[in-house]
Amino acid sequence: MDQIRLTHLRQLEAESIHIIREVAAEFSNPVMLYSIGKDSSVMLHLARKAFYPGTLPFPLLHVDTGWKFREMYEFRDRTAKAYGCELLVHKNPEGVAMGINPFVHGSAKHTDIMKTEGLKQALNKYSFDAAFGGARRDEEKSRAKERIYSFRDRFHRWDPKNQRPELWHNYNGQINKGESIRVFPLSNWTEQDIWQYIWLENIDIVPLYLAAERPVLERDGMLMMIDDNRIDLQPGEVIKKRMVRFRTLGCWPLTGAVESNAQTLPEIIEEMLVSTTSERQGRVIDRDQAGSMELKKRQGYF
């Protein structure tokens, strides 16, 4: 491959497709974690390219908390149907029985039970030995030091001090029974790369990424979009219509919007050129405590 003649986006694309094909060939039962966000959309697009004109040789897995935006659920089902993907949806039955929700139990407990434990349940249920994730190194400091092939023990835990060297695009996928690998094909992409690639490839995304007038209220320094009636307003809180969009998507009570007028992909790309903050600044779960993301990943988080 002539690296000099490839644009940086095509180099990233080629690297990601190589990783996806390597995993499909090397592991017996891989799965692609599908969170419905922009990174998942890019990863799914790359996987479809990797095996075109055939179908994906692995299913998609969505770990559902029951608190995603309604537009995300609609997009998930429409996308899986349009591309003919096998879609597995898992919701932690114990969490559902306990009535876990982010307002009553807080973001840390909600995330641990509905996302981390839910994910581990699904991986155990289907005996997946490799799981693709859409995490990128530029998102957050614990992800910055994680390998593309992220080794997990039989309890799905990550030990940042026990990572394997990855030299010259050679990946060590050797695991023992019960162990697994999380694989991050987008590790070397930036948020700007993701948006430029979405524009270049005309990839469909959830409309929440584009600015529009939406009902929001300010709570704990975050602009919370009110997506349904499962919220009790606190004294003095007022729901107002404001021009906002989302840089990252998750559970609607835990994902802050940003004020923006970017209604098209070129406008988002232009906005990113002058941005000085991480896209995850609106994620409440990242602020639960110092080193929050690394602690979650050590316990088995995405």
Curated annotation (Swiss-Prot):
Which GO biological-process labels does this protein carry?
hydrogen sulfide biosynthetic process; sulfate assimilation
Record has Nucleus as a keyword:
no
Q: Give the multimer and partner information.
A: Heterodimer composed of CysD, the smaller subunit, and CysN.
Q: Per its database record, what is this protein's job?
A: With CysN forms the ATP sulfurylase (ATPS) that catalyzes the adenylation of sulfate producing adenosine 5'-phosphosulfate (APS) and diphosphate, the first enzymatic step in sulfur assimilation pathway. APS synthesis involves the formation of a high-energy phosphoric-sulfuric acid anhydride bond driven by GTP hydrolysis by CysN coupled to ATP hydrolysis by CysD.
Give the family from UniProt: Belongs to the PAPS reductase family. CysD subfamily.
> Lineage of the native species?
Bacteria, Pseudomonadati, Pseudomonadota, Gammaproteobacteria, Enterobacterales
The name of this protein is: Sulfate adenylyltransferase subunit 2
GO molecular function annotation:
ATP binding; sulfate adenylyltransferase (ATP) activity
Q: What is its EC number?
A: 2.7.7.4
* PANTHER family for the chain: SULFATE ADENYLYLTRANSFERASE SUBUNIT 2
What are the protein's UniProt keywords?
ATP-binding, Nucleotide-binding, Nucleotidyltransferase, Transferase
What reaction gets catalysed by this protein?
sulfate + ATP + H(+) = adenosine 5'-phosphosulfate + diphosphate
Q: In which pathway does it act?
A: Sulfur metabolism; hydrogen sulfide biosynthesis; sulfite from sulfate: step 1/3
